[in-house]
């Protein structure tokens, strides 16, 4: 049976970039565990801030952490107090001086992770899954998406037997590497169990950088 590869992982080095950028040698495992723990802790701590991505770079003996969020004001706090506290916490966690950047996600309707988390939250509030899916699809297409696909799996509506439901609108060409496809997942913890949410959003096509530069040179 055919399985689907992660659409972001397969495009790394073509049109997508890595979320962690560093070279570690023998300390690879240590750095990887630090990154995973930091992302997990920040996601829990900043749940109200609608965090999309956390980018980590480690140049020389320091670190640069960039948080992409739909609500930067929640993280920054009054007079920037929240951001300084957060920077100290991250610095203690990584054990090196940290430079912290906060970037705003201009269109959260086109961010697959935020869309998936939005649907998961609605399911926890007992909104009908079809209504939550349809609302997300309509918002994404209004915001300029070329296509969107959503899958929710689990005991939908409290059913005895778990199943998967799909909703798709527009084009989502997973096999086209130049297609800019954002992918995000979330879990909804309901009284009947966990419901998994997956979202694919097609934003248009991008020419890989090398190809674009050679074409402009010609």
Swiss-Prot record:
This is Small ribosomal subunit protein uS3. Pfam families: KH_2, Ribosomal_S3_C. Binds the lower part of the 30S subunit head. Binds mRNA in the 70S ribosome, positioning it for translation. Keywords: Ribonucleoprotein, Ribosomal protein, RNA-binding, rRNA-binding. InterPro entries: KH_dom, KH_dom-like_a/b, KH_dom_type_2, KH_sf_prok-type, Ribosomal_S3_C_sf, Ribosomal_uS3_bac-typ, Ribosomal_uS3_C, Ribosomal_uS3_CS. Belongs to the universal ribosomal protein uS3 family. The keyword Disulfide bond does not apply. GO terms for molecular function: mRNA binding; rRNA binding; structural constituent of ribosome. One of its GO terms (cellular component) is cytosolic small ribosomal subunit. It comes from Legionella pneumophila (strain Lens). Residues 38-106 form the KH type-2 domain. The keyword rRNA-binding applies. One of its GO terms (biological process) is translation. SMART domains: KH. It comes from the Bacteria. Part of the 30S ribosomal subunit. Forms a tight complex with proteins S10 and S14.
């Amino acid at each position: 049976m055919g399985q689907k590869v992660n659409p972001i992982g397969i495009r790394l080095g073509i049109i997508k970039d890595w979320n962690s950028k560093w070279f570690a040698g023998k300390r690879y495992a240590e750095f990887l565990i630090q990154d995973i723990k930091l992302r997990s802790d920040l996601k829990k701590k900043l749940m109200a801030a609608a965090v999309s991505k956390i980018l980590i770079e480690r140049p020389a003996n320091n670190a640069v952490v960039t948080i992409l969020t739909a609500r930067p004001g929640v993280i920054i706090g009054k007079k920037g107090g929240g951001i300084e506290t957060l920077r100290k916490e991250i610095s203690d966690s990584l054990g090196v001086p940290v430079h912290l950047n906060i970037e705003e996600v201009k269109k959260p309707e086109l961010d697959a992770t935020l869309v998936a988390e939005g649907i998961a939250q609605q399911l926890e509030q007992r909104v009908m899954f079809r209504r939550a899916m349809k609302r997300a699809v309509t918002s994404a297409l209004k915001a300029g998406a070329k296509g969107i696909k959503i899958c929710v799996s689990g005991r939908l509506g409290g059913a005895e037997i778990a199943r998967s439901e799909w909703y798709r609108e527009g084009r989502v060409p997973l096999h086209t590497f130049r297609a800019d496809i954002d992918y995000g997942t979330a879990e909804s913890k309901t009284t009947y169990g966990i419901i998994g949410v997956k979202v694919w959003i097609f934003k248009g096509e991008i020419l890989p950088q090398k190809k674009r530069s050679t074409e402009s040179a010609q």
